[in-house]
Amino acid sequence: MRPSDRTPAQSRPVTITRQFTAHAEGSVLIEFGETKVLCTASFTEGVPRFLKGQGQGWVTAEYGMLPRSTHSRMDREAARGKQSGRTQEIQRLIGRALRAAVDMKALGENTIVIDCDVIQADGGTRTAAITGACVALVDALNWARGKGLIKTNPLKFLIAAVSVGIYKGEPICDLEYVEDSAAETDMNVVMTETGKIIEIQGTAEGEPFSHEELLSLLDLAKHGIREIVDVQKAALS
C-alpha cells in the first residue's frame, strides 16, 4: 500500500496554470500533487557564439529550488558560490529533453531560455519541470509567431515526464518524496506525446532490478505520461 493510498499505476493530480506571471513569453505553474514548479520561457533574438551563422536556434534551461521549497531551509546556491552537481544534471536534462521537441532550423537564429524554479518539493521536481516547461515553450513559440519573429511553428511534438520506481518490491508511478526516499529503484522517463522515449534515467538505489521489472516500469511511465499529456493538451486548448 502506498502512503497516499494511490494504486501502483496512479499518478498524482496534475494542474497546469498558464500565463502565471506577466513578463515572460511563456509562463506556467505546474503542480504534481504537492510538488509545485514555476516554469518560464524567454524568447530572445540571437544565438550563442558557437551557433552564429548556422541558421538555427537554441533552447537551454536553468533549474533551481527556492530555499524553503523543502522541509527545512537550504541556502541559495548563489550564496554558496556554485551550483550543485544535482542542479547541473537536472537543468541539462531539461534542456536536452526540450531540444528534442524543437526543429532548430525552423526556430531560426533565436534562443529560448527555460527557467524552472521549484516552489515546493515533494518528489518528481525534474519531471514536473520538464512537463511544465514544455507548455511554457509552446506559449513562447506562439508568441514569437504572433510577432512575426518566426515563420512556422518549430514544435515537433509535446513532451512530458514522470518518475517511476520500485517501492517495497512493487513497481509504482509518480513517486512522492516519502516513496522516492525509500525506493529500491528510482527512474525518470521522458517521452513524446506518442509514447516514444527521449530519455531514461534509472538507478538501483537498493536492490538491482530485473529486465522484466524495467519493462514494467516503462509501461507504467508510458501510461502515466499519456495521462499527463492529456492535461497539457487540455491546458493548451
Swiss-Prot record:
Gene Ontology terms, MF aspect: 3'-5'-RNA exonuclease activity; tRNA binding; tRNA nucleotidyltransferase activity
Pfam families: RNase_PH, RNase_PH_C
Keywords on record: Nucleotidyltransferase, RNA-binding, rRNA processing, Transferase, tRNA processing, tRNA-binding
Keyword Lipid metabolism: no
Disulfide partners: none
CDD domains in UniProt: RNase_PH_bact
Protein origin, superkingdom: Bacteria
Binding locations of phosphate: 86, 124-126
Alphabetized Gene3D superfamilies for the sequence: GHMP Kinase, N-terminal domain
GO terms (BP aspect): rRNA catabolic process; rRNA processing; tRNA processing
Assigned EC number: 2.7.7.56
Keyword tRNA processing attached: yes
Catalytic activity: tRNA(n+1) + phosphate = tRNA(n) + a ribonucleoside 5'-diphosphate
Annotated coiled-coil segments of the chain: none
Top EC class, one word: transferase
Protein task: Phosphorolytic 3'-5' exoribonuclease that plays an important role in tRNA 3'-end maturation. Removes nucleotide residues following the 3'-CCA terminus of tRNAs; can also add nucleotides to the ends of RNA molecules by using nucleoside diphosphates as substrates, but this may not be physiologically important. Probably plays a role in initiation of 16S rRNA degradation (leading to ribosome degradation) during starvation.
Subunit record text: Homohexameric ring arranged as a trimer of dimers.
Recorded family membership: Belongs to the RNase PH family.
Protein name, entry field: Ribonuclease PH
Organism: Shewanella loihica (strain ATCC BAA-1088 / PV-4)
